[in-house]
Each structure stands twice: as structure tokens, then as C-alpha cells.
Amino acid sequence: MSAQAYYELYRGSSLGLSLTDTLDDLINEGRIEPQLAMKILSTFDRVITEVLADKVRTRLTFKGHLDTYRFCDEVWTFLIKDVNFKLDNQQTISADKVKIVSCNSKRPGEA
């Protein structure tokens, strides 16, 4: 069984940051080894990617002013200002700034 590499994007989410903080605390207290923490984070990367791809079906549209965009290492980054999101249920949510990171579902070089 070959280990597929997953992007680590979701480690920067509130859930990922909480997990990382908790793992750091456990390492500092000597309750787990750093290698176990890395295995847990790798599992988190895989599971959150699979769950979001399989379970999330809500659609939204958004409109805003594109401030900055970048394309580096097969990853697009968009910084958008004055954004309005419109959800499936017609609810509207506004934000001053939004950062969108978009990458291929497969890493470069993967079949």
C-alpha cells in the first residue's frame, strides 16, 4: 500500500489549529511522541480531504473585488475584498476580506 500525500491546507483551519495545539501540549507533557503527532496530522490531512469531497453538497456563489492573485507551485491564491456570499437557502453573508487557496486534486507528478 503506497502512502498518498495530501495537502496540509486544512491544518490552518480552526479545527486543524486546535488539533495541532492539542498535539503540541501532549508532546510537551511527554504523553505522546512527536512521530505519533505527525501520523495523526497525516491522518487528519487525508480524512478531512475525503470527508469534504464526499459529504459537502451545499453550493454558494460569491461576488467581490479581486485584490491580489498568485499562482505558485500549482497552487492558486486569491485575495478578495468586500465579498458577498449567497448560500443555497438564499442567505447572504458578507466579509471584508477573503483568502481562497485552490489546488489540483492531485499533486504534480501524480498519475
Curated annotation (Swiss-Prot):
Protein's UniProt keywords contain Transcription regulation: yes
Main location: nucleus
A GO cellular component annotation in the UniProt record: transcription factor TFIIA complex
UniProt KW Nucleus keyword: yes
Domain of life: Eukaryota
One Pfam short name: TFIIA_gamma_N
Gene Ontology terms describing biological process: positive regulation of transcription initiation by RNA polymerase II; RNA polymerase II preinitiation complex assembly
Family matches, as CDD domains: TFIIA_gamma_C (cd10014), TFIIA_gamma_N (cd10145)
Database matches in Gene3D superfamilies: Transcription factor IIA (TFIIA), beta-barrel domain (2.30.18.10), Transcription factor IIA gamma subunit, alpha-helical domain (1.10.287.190)
GO terms, molecular function: RNA polymerase II core promoter sequence-specific DNA binding; RNA polymerase II general transcription initiation factor activity; TBP-class protein binding
Location in the cell: Nucleus
InterPro entries reported for this sequence: TFIIA_a-hlx, TFIIA_b-brl, TFIIA_gsu, TFIIA_gsu_C, TFIIA_gsu_N
SUPFAM superfamilies noted in UniProt: Transcription factor IIA (TFIIA), alpha-helical domain, Transcription factor IIA (TFIIA), beta-barrel domain
UniProt entry keywords in alphabetical sequence: Nucleus, Transcription, Transcription regulation
Family membership: Belongs to the TFIIA subunit 2 family.
Function, in words: TFIIA is a component of the transcription machinery of RNA polymerase II and plays an important role in transcriptional activation. TFIIA in a complex with tbp mediates transcriptional activity.
Subunit structure of this chain's protein: TFIIA is a heterodimer composed of the large toa1 and the small toa2 subunits.
Protein name listed in UniProt: Transcription initiation factor IIA subunit 2
